[in-house]
Amino acid sequence: MTTTLRLATLDDVDELRALMTLSIRRLIGAYFDADRVEASYEIMGLDTQLIEDGTYFTVLSGERIVGCGGWSRRATMFGGDHSGGRSSRLLDPATEAARVRAMYTHPDFARRGIGTRVLAACEAAAAAEGFTVLELVATVAGEPLYAANGFTLVERIDVPTARGIAIPCARMRRGVSVNAVRGANPGG
């Protein structure tokens, strides 16, 4: 399968949201009952600030977006435009971890390396801005991908929703690889 990685644009928003909805329904739905899947939409989805910041990637098969994800230099850990608890505060790369955010793959393209490809792009971009640590909040569906890519569990958290249904997640982190730092700083 040949794919192309590129930065997302605001023109991609509708297609990204449709992909996220499908991914949540089918991939998260393999772990949760229907009520918990519906509640998940409150804490997941597209944060267009990532697109505006130039830190959100898409993976295309032909002209079709089959995966997406990004990283952030801002304090928000997870959630879409509609989610509460967001913060636009800029992180200090010397003392804080860059955030890996909003990773989604079309269910028909799952487990084909798309998530790993997006993670590598996020890592290289964050390293280029001086970040040495990556952190994220993983869903139960995403946790195996992150573990396979060197992220370790910091803590298990239950994220509350307005429906009164908690969504089990895992806060995970890892250092930026030496190769990403070298790629971000040629000669370094």
Residue positions per predicted region:
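Conserved N-terminal entry element of GNAT/NAT acetyltransferase domains
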Residues: 1-14, 177-188
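Short loop/turn motifs at secondary-structure junctions and domain boundaries
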Residues: 47-53
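Active-site beta-strand termini and strand-to-loop segments that position acidic
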Residues: 60-62, 174-175
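C-terminal "cap" of GNAT-fold acetyltransferases
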Residues: 132, 137-143, 149, 155-188
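Conserved acetyl-CoA pyrophosphate-binding loop and the N-cap/start of the following alpha-helix
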Residues: 109, 113-121
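Conserved acyl-donor/pantetheine-binding loop and adjacent beta-alpha core of acyl/acetyltransferases
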Residues: 53, 60, 66-110, 125, ...
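Conserved GNAT-fold acetyl-CoA-binding loop/helix
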Residues: 21-46
